[in-house]
Amino acid sequence: MNLRSAAAGSPRASRRPEAIAGYLFIAVPVLLFLVLNIGALVYAVYISVWKWNLRTGPVTFIGLQNYQDALADPVFQTAIKNTIYYTAVWVPLTMILGLSLALIVNQKLRGQTFFRGAFYFPAIASSAAITMLWIFIMAPDGLFNGVRGLLGLDPLFELFGYGPHQNWIGDQRTAMNTVILLNAWTTSGTFMLFYLASLQSISNQVYEAAAIDGASWWQAFWKVTMPLLRPGHFFVATVAVIGGLQLFDQALIGGGVNGDPNNALMTMVLYLYNAAFRQFNFSYAAAIGLILFVLIFSATLVQRKLFGTAPEW
């Protein structure tokens, strides 16, 4: 047998057609990713340093002027503050709610499937429809004010300056917090599923060992469950921060294109939307998008550093 025939009959040679077929299958998705994601990012960087016209394309090279104008704009500064505040409050609140719901439905309870579906339902409902419903609920004559009046809670709310006909989403003091509560309700079901998958990946042997050592439920949760959920925490926190920094539809529906009242609901993505599709200043909008990209990327790196990896047992 010569070397050529031996090579032809080797396992590596026999797997070569399968490898080629595999590369052909992934070629189209990889190409689309490079064009639609990496290509779009590179092009955004390119047009952000030009005075860009919708009809003629790049006209005048202006360097970092778009970035300087954006960072000097008081409205954009407000948008950054609102976006960071929303993310800083909404992310931990929703993670706590999601984990709490996951712990509940992870138990062997009667009607477990029903509760899982009920908790998850707001996440699959139309965001626009739920936001409109929430606006009616939180209106001056809405359900929330009516219920707290029936419960005799008006004096308590008046201590904080909120009258019996408080317009929660129309007041600069409460508008963003109202949106935070809305999104905590609608997205906690999704995070519940993420945490439920992480909880079910933990071996029962770990809990049995903790029980033998005399650990209480709280000790087992804090010393066993929480450390083993680090990868789950990282995934949920990353998804949440990316979503939080891109808050748009609820802010647009609740406060209009100007983020009313008084820019209380102005976010970075809403500001970007106005620059691109109301002012048609696409180079300026590209600069805003890249600032948002840097913020999201930096937040992801910080979370990776904080959560690290799960311990070995």
Identify the residue ranges that each predicted region occupies.
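Short, Lys/Arg-rich, polar N-terminal cytosolic tail immediately upstream
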Residues: 1-16
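A structural signal for multi-pass alpha-helical bundles of membrane permease subunits
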Residues: 18-313
